[in-house]
Every structure is written in structure tokens, then in C-alpha cells.
């Protein structure tokens, strides 16, 4: 079987290179070169000959297939891209999902020649009740899925969707099949399970069980997925080996290990369950690998882990090479590779050192230790390769992951078993389902409670914001490699101590300049929005918290503050109630302790204002409405908050702030336009400032010449991201340049930090 491994692994590696790293035209000549290289195999003897031949064949196959697939499937799909909407016919391929502006759904474009490419369509609320299999017509503008919000993205391409469609005038239902196609049975089964979960489970855990059982992470309570990420257990809501192995084990247990019927039923059940959960790479990997392990005894072969892993990887990549860019696939196979490589050796070593006890209590205690040590070895093995992958893709690493996995693994296993049983029972017997759900809810609440509590701790996760932290990450793996090389001579305590020491040194080196400065002003990169952190003397004030970046702006602010070693925000100031300035407040209040909230007393009927006030009351925040100018101090800073000076709209009725620390002064104007800026100059005493947080994301109607002449800023930072408004406007940039400002853009630089050391 190892011959299959020598073919599958190079082929998969070539596909990864062709999709993720190499220029588009390079796989074809590389494939031809590798094929020619295989002709050199007769120059070798013995096993080396077939290893060279299989490796060359695998590389050639991978490179050539990647090139051919792009020509046959991706390029024809991209040919539909255009600036103007065109009416097309589509077959709906999934239940529509609600979005902030309507619904989205995957659909197959139908042409006169037959079935065309898959398209992710975004439409308004007027679509009606669409079902998988429906035939619809709509005018859509088709764009490449490789560009989302102006940035490179591989989320859709890794799923075989190369086009995004934006419906212009609604969606018209043309036809509906009389019977549901077999292709859509798993989706209807998933919908039935999700409906059953909502019926039988309490509201506080229904979303968690929907994610745990069906993989639908969008059902999680607000902020729960971020809690799971920071605490290192987000993998539990990605359907994988934990879920699949239970189904297979239960079937085999009922029908016997050597039963062919039991084996094939288990395989069918696993494949169907993977389809129910959306055919994610992690679910398919688990289903196929478990199937190979079940089939091996029936065909008289010993299971070979490297062969099984590489063969399943190739099986997933051949029908869809661009799945190589899927983060889910990379994390899933990385976790299993790490477990295969080190977990068994670790657990054997630890269990050999474990003493035996003869008394009943001693035996029970030993079993608990065995479970804990085996769980820890699996966790560490899974983290071996997934940690650098997570650091690369998410710029964050959970430091609490091993501990939280130990605390929650039993609850996750029990919750999945109990939750699936309750959901299935609820399909026919709702009363029985509710009774079982009441029991299953207990471990789920434990998992959510632990994840939420740990996520609020400083340093529970390390966001790679600094070169020092990235350097530590590289050093940590260097220490690990050196220990593996000399593990017979080096005690494990030495590299463990080195890892802890270097981590502490990296964290202190990163945080010390910020914490020791008289004042640090950080314009956070929240996309098209604003969020500015003022930090002084260990105390922090956040001005605004909104944006349209991929991460919740509340999470971004909380991550940044917790990276400085604190989970307390002394005050939150909101200039006005627009989502690009206040949309992240719910998650911010869920993550941090915020005792004071300063708000403008305007637009009392605004829904966002009402939501913020309700959350403030629920979290025990003291709310101060500012109708007059207010002045207060924190750390070494004096902060003056100017009451609204305009009228007519939220932008004009917002707060503005002047921050003073020694000789350093900064001005924040929110979304103030030039008319209100002139009022600010006229009615308030504005000094010359060092830093201007440019108003309204660099709009041409803000940052007037009068304001720049009045305050003469030396530096200016513009908080903006992908938008359709033209921010920052060329006119604003020209005025700032003419005023002699050094200009910094969060869009290009990420978080922008200014540290004032004092005299």
C-alpha cells in the first residue's frame, strides 16, 4: 500500500503548489518536466527505482491536472464576468441563507448547452420561499469570487464556486420539480435536524447544538464562535473525526466488527452524514479515512495511516483541485497528520511512567489520568501542524487550547451523542426529544461557559500583531525541532521552560513600549469604520467601535487590548450611532469589562442606540449622555469631549474629542462635515495638535482647509477600508498634503499606533 502513498502524496503536493503558490501558467511546464524526469527512474535500482518513478508520476499528474482543470472548468466560468446585469436561468442548489441585505444561495447556471458553472447569488428579501431544485430566472451582474470587498479571497473558489452573482430586480420562480431529487436529500435531512433542534433544545444552547451536529456555525449565539476560537476549541463545530467515528462505532457495535453488512452500513451512514453537514473537507476526510480503516480487515490488509491519509487527500483534490486552498481542508489534514506523527508515541511514553494502584479508588483515579493523558497527547498532536496554519490564516494562536480541550472534551463528546439522539427523537416524539435535550444541554452549557470565561482572559490567545510575537513563533518551532533531534539527551522540562521564557519575553517586549508610554493612540484597522484606542498608565478609553472588516470590530478591539494584558476598558465613547462607528459594541461588551459609556443624547428612536442601551444595562455599564462639554482624566491624559454642534443628521450631531498628554495633543472629529468643523473652530478653543484622526474616513466633505489651518496637525491617520464611497477622497488627501501632514491609512498599514513617551 505504500506505493499508493508514494504516488498520492507527490500528486497532492503538486496540486497544492499549483493552486496556492505558483503563477497560473507554471504548472503545465512543470508537469511536463516532472513527466520527463520519470524517465530517469531506470538509472536507479531496487526500491529506489519505483519510488523515483511514482514520485515523478505523482508530481506530473498533479501539475498537469491542475492546469487542465483550470482550462476546462475555471476559465469558462470566468468568461461570464461582466459589468452589466444579464438575465440567466439557474437551478437552486441550497436553501437560501439570510444576510444583512436579503438572502444568498448557491445555484447552477443553466445554458442551452447544459449545466454551467456554480454561482453564489446575493438577492433581496423579495425572493420568496425558494427550495433546492427550483428553477429561477433573474438578472445578475456576475463577478469573480476571488475578489471579496476588494481583497483576494479563496473561500468560494476552494468550494468550486468561481462566480458571485448580484441580483438586480428580484428572482422569478420558473419551475419546481414534483419530487425532491436524490441530490438534495441530505439538505432536506439537515433542515429537518435543524428544525428539530430548535424545537426541543433550550434557546441558550440550540445554536450550539445546530453547529455541533450539522456544522452550521452561523447558528451559534453572537460571539460564541470567537469564544471557541480564542479558547482553542473552535474545531468542535467543524464536523470531523469526533462525529464520524461515533456514528461508525455505534453501527459496528450493533452489527459486529467483522460484519460486512455492518461495515457497508457504517460507510453509507458516514457518507450521508458528511453530505448532511455540507460535505466540508473535514467531514469528508473523516468519512473516507474511517471507511478505509473499516474496509482493510475485510480485504485482508493492515491499515496503513500514511497511505490512508495521502489517498484520501488525493481523493478530495482530484475532483476539485482548488479545494487545496480551503482552510478547513488544511487544518483537518494537518491535525490528523500531527496525531499520527506524535500522539501515540507521547501517550505510550506517559502511560509507561504512570504508576498502578490496586485499590478501587486508585484504579478509578488511574483511568481518569489515562483519559486525561491520552486526550492531551491527541490535542498536542493536532496542534503540531494546525498551530502554524492558524497563525498564517488567522494571525492568532490560542495559548489556552490544550487546557480547555482537557476541560471540555468529555462534555463535547457527551453533548454530541446526547444532542444527536435528542434531535433524532424530536423528529417523531417531541416530548421525548425535549427530555433528552434537557440532559444534553448541561455539557453544552459547560463548554460555552468555559470558552466564554477563558476568552475574556488576557493572553488566552496571542494575536500576532508584532514582529516579536512572530519571531517567538518561529523560535518556538525551532526549539521543538532541536528537542526532537536530541530528545534522548534532553529532558522535556528544558524545552518547555525555554518556550515559556521566550513567550514571556516576546509578550513583554511587544507590550512594554505601549504600556510604558505617556500616551498611546492606536487607530484600529476595522475596515470601513472607526475605532481608536487611547492607552495611558494602564488605563484605556476606546472611541467608537464599528467597521466592515471580516472580523467583528468589537473582537478586534478586545483582542488588541487583551494583547496588552488587560480585559478592562475604562470607558467607551461613541461619537454617533452609525454601525461603522458603533456596530461592534455588542461583542465588545461581551468580551471586556466596560464600566462607563459616553454617548451623544440624540436620535432617541435609533434602533442601534436602543440596542446599545439595553446591552449597557444588562452588563452593568454606567451610561452618561453628553449634552454639554465634558472633561475627565485617565492615566496621564486629559480628555475633553465636545457636545454635538450640528443638527440634521447623526454625522452632524456627533461628539468630538480633544486628547492632551503633556505636549502631545490629538483631535478626533468623528464623521463631522466641514460646516460643523467651522462651528468647532469658532466656539471651542482648539490648540495646535500633533495628530488628527481624519473625519468621516477621509470624505471630501470633511477635513476642511479651515480646520487644518486652525489646528495645524503634523500627522493624520485615516481609518477606512473597502467601500463604494470613494474614501479617502483625493480632495481630502490633497488638503492634508498641502497642510504638510504625514498621512497614514489603516487600509494599507493595518493598526496604526502612535506612542508619546513624554518629556
Q: What is each residue range found by the language model?
A:
Residues 217, 317-325, 452-571, 617-691, ...:
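Core dinuclear metal-dependent hydrolase active-site scaffold
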Residues 60-235, 555-562, 568, 602-604, ...:
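Membrane-interface helix/helix-cap signal primarily in integral membrane proteins
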Residues 6, 14, 54-57, 222-402, ...:
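Hydrophobic alpha-helical transmembrane segments in multi-pass membrane proteins
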Residues 1-42, 434-485:
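Membrane-embedded alpha-helical segments of integral membrane proteins
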Residues 596, 677-751:
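Cap/insert and terminal regions of metallo-dependent hydrolase folds
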Residues 1-79, 189, 285:
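N-terminal leader/targeting segments
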Residues 569-580, 602-603, 692-696:
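Metallo-beta-lactamase
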Residues 158-294, 571, 596, 639, ...:
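Aromatic-rich juxtamembrane segments at the membrane interface
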Amino acid at each position: 500500500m505504500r506505493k499508493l502513498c508514494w504516488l498520492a502524496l507527490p500528486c497532492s503536493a503538486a496540486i497544492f503548489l499549483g493552486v496556492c503558490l505558483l503563477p497560473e501558467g507554471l504548472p503545465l511546464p512543470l508537469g511536463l518536466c516532472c513527466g520527463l524526469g520519470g524517465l530517469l527512474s531506470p538509472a536507479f535500482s531496487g526500491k529506489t527505482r519505483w519510488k523515483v518513478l511514482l514520485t515523478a508520476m505523482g508530481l506530473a499528474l498533479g501539475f498537469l491536472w491542475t492546469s487542465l482543470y483550470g482550462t476546462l472548468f475555471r476559465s469558462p466560468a470566468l468568461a461570464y464576468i461582466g459589468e452589466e446585469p444579464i438575465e440567466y436561468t439557474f437551478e437552486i442548489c441550497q436553501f437560501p441563507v439570510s444576510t444583512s441585505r436579503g438572502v444568498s444561495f448557491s445555484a447552477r447556471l443553466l445554458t442551452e448547452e447544459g449545466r454551467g458553472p456554480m454561482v453564489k447569488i446575493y438577492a433581496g428579501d423579495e425572493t420568496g420561499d425558494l427550495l433546492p431544485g427550483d428553477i429561477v430566472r433573474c438578472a445578475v451582474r456576475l463577478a469573480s469570487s476571488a475578489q471579496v470587498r476588494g481583497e483576494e479571497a479563496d473561500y468560494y473558489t476552494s468550494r468550486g464556486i468561481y462566480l458571485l452573482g448580484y441580483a438586480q430586480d428580484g428572482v422569478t420562480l420558473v419551475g419546481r420539480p414534483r419530487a425532491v431529487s436524490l441530490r438534495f436529500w441530505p439538505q432536506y435531512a439537515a433542515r429537518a435536524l435543524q428544525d428539530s433542534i430548535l424545537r426541543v433544545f433550550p434557546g441558550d444552547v440550540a445554536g450550539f447544538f445546530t453547529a455541533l451536529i450539522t456544522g452550521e456555525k452561523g447558528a451559534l449565539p453572537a460571539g460564541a464562535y470567537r469564544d471557541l476560537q480564542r479558547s482553542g476549541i473552535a474545531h468542535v463545530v467543524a464536523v470531523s473525526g469526533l462525529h464520524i467515528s461515533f456514528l461508525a462505532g455505534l453501527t459496528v457495535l450493533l452489527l459486529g466488527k467483522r460484519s460486512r453488512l455492518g461495515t457497508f452500513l457504517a460507510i453509507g451512514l458516514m457518507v450521508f452524514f458528511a453530505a448532511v453537514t455540507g460535505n466540508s473537507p473535514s467531514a469528508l476526510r473523516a468519512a473516507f479515512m474511517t471507511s478505509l480503516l473499516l474496509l482493510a480487515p475485510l480485504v485482508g490488509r493492515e491499515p496503513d495511516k500514511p497511505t490512508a491519509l495521502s489517498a484520501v487527500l488525493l481523493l478530495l483534490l482530484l475532483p476539485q483541485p482548488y479545494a487545496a486552498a480551503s482552510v478547513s481542508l488544511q487544518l483537518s489534514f494537518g491535525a490528523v497528520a500531527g496525531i499520527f506523527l506524535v500522539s501515540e508515541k507521547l501517550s505510550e511514553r506517559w502511560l509507561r511512567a504512570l504508576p498502578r494502584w490496586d485499590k478501587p479508588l486508585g484504579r478509578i483515579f488511574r483511568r481518569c489520568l489515562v483519559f486525561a493523558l491520552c486526550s492531551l497527547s491527541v490535542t498536542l498532536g493536532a496542534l503540531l501542524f494546525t498551530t502554524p496554519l492558524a497563525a498564517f490564516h488567522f494571525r492568532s494562536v490560542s495559548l489556552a487550547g490544550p487546557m480547555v480541550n482537557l476541560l471540555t472534551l468529555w462534555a463535547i463528546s457527551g453533548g454530541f451523542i446526547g444532542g444527536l439522539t435528542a434531535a433524532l427523537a424530536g423528529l417523531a416524539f417531541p416530548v421525548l426529544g425535549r427530555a433528552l435535550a434537557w440532559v444534553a444541554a448541561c455539557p453544552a452549557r459547560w463548554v460555552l461557559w468555559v470558552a466564554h470565561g477563558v476568552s475574556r482572559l488576557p493572553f488566552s490567545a496571542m494575536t500576532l500583531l508584532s514582529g516579536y510575537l512572530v519571531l517567538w513563533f518561529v523560535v518556538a518551532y525551532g526549539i521543538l525541532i532541536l528537542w526532537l533531534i536530541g530528545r534522548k539527551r534532553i529532558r522535556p522540562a528544558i524545552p518547555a521552560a525555554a518556550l515559556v521564557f521566550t513567550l514571556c519575553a516576546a509578550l513583554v517586549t511587544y507590550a512594554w513600549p505601549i504600556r510604558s508610554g505617556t500616551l498611546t493612540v492606536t487607530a484600529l484597522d476595522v475596515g470601513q469604520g472607526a475605532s481608536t484606542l487611547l492607552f495611558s498608565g494602564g488605563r484605556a478609553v476606546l472611541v467608537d467601535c464599528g467597521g466592515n472588516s471580516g472580523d467583528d470590530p468589537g473582537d478586534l478591539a478586545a483582542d488588541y487590548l487583551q494583547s496588552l494584558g488587560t480585559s478592562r476598558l475604562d470607558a467607551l465613547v461613541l461619537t454617533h450611532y452609525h454601525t461603522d462607528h458603533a456596530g461592534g459594541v455588542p461583542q465588545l461588551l461581551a468580551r471586556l469589562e466596560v464600566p462607563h459609556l459616553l454617548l451623544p443624547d440624540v436620535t432617541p428612536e435609533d434602533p442601534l442606540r436602543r440596542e446599545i442601551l439595553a446591552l449597557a444595562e444588562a452588563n452593568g455599564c454606567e451610561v452618561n449622555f453628553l449634552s454639554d462639554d465634558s472633561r475627565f482624566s485617565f492615566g496621564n491624559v486629559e480628555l475633553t469631549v465636545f457636545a454635538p454642534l450640528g443638527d440634521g443628521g447623526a454625522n452632524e450631531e456627533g461628539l468630538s474629542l480633544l486628547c492632551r498628554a503633556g505636549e502631545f495633543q490629538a483631535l478626533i472629529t468623528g464623521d463631522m462635515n466641514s460646516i460643523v468643523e467651522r462651528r468647532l473652530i469658532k466656539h471651542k478653543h482648539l490648540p495646535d495638535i500633533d495628530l488628527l484622526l481624519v473625519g468621516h474616513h477621509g470624505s471630501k466633505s470633511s477635513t476642511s482647509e479651515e480646520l487644518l489651518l486652525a489646528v495645524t496637525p503634523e500627522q493624520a491617520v485615516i481609518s477606512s477600508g473597502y467601500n463604494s464611497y470613494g474614501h479617502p477622497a483625493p480632495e481630502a488627501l490633497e488638503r492634508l498634503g498641502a497642510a504638510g501632514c504625514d498621512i497614514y491609512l489603516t487600509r494599507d498599514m493595518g493598526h496604526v499606533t502612535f506612542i508619546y513617551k513624554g518629556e
